[in-house]
Amino acid sequence: MGLHPDGDAPHAAATTLPMSSPAKPLPSTRVWRDWRLLTLATGMALGLFAQIGLLAHLFSLLVPALDAQLAGFAAGGATASAILGRTLVGWLMPARADRRLFGCANYAVQILGSLAFLFAAGDNIPLLLLGVVLFGAGIGNTTSLPPMIAQAEFSQEDVSRVVPLIVAVGQGTYAFAPAVFGLIRELAPRWGSASAGAAPWLFLAAALIQILAVVAFFIGRPRKA
């Protein structure tokens, strides 16, 4: 608004960081062939696919061990964990940090959550709750970090194209996640006398998909000159 605090010089220049990368804009025909976009869209889509697929079945997998009421509170705890995870990234990520590495770390935390669910075997309550906290911590960052990565890697003109593209790819991909994870849950063989809440193949699938998402983010890191 052009206003300044009392005592400041009226024309004092504010120090600001650029909102996007100084990279040159890409021709419209080359956007989909850009390695950064391909790896960013792939990493986001895979991460969302694993996340939505697992979350769609999480409540029903918690019920056998926690009962419906406590399972509802636990599922709500994932949302609280998501808020905390997003806040921590906001505090810890420097303005000029390699945001892809933070995206990789975010998926790594969720992978640990999937493994906690796996080793809980459907009835180890402390591990189930640990899984909720770890997996939930990445929920918000999975959607917020990819646009921030695009902002750091693409020119201002390209950001307005890249962000809608990666979001559309992610949405089109994760729309099928609940059904695919449901098929895994129903058709995969059971492990011995596992409890009703055990779904080892589902949690393994989530972890493996997110490992692929980590790889996609990592190999797309811009090369330093």
Residue ranges and their predicted role:
Residues 10-37:
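Juxtamembrane intracellular "pre-TM" segments in multi-pass secondary transporters
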Residues 34-90, 177-178:
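Extracytoplasmic gate region of multi-pass secondary transporters
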Residues 45, 127-141:
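Hydrophobic core of transmembrane alpha-helices in multi-pass small-molecule transporters
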Residues 85-98, 185:
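Helix-to-loop junctions at the C-terminal end of transmembrane segments
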Residues 101-116:
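Structural signature of the two symmetry-related core transmembrane helices
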Residues 139, 153-190:
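A late C-terminal transmembrane helix in Major Facilitator Superfamily
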Residues 183-209:
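A membrane-interface helix-boundary motif in multi-pass transporters
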Residues 204-225:
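Multi-pass alpha-helical transporter architecture, strongest
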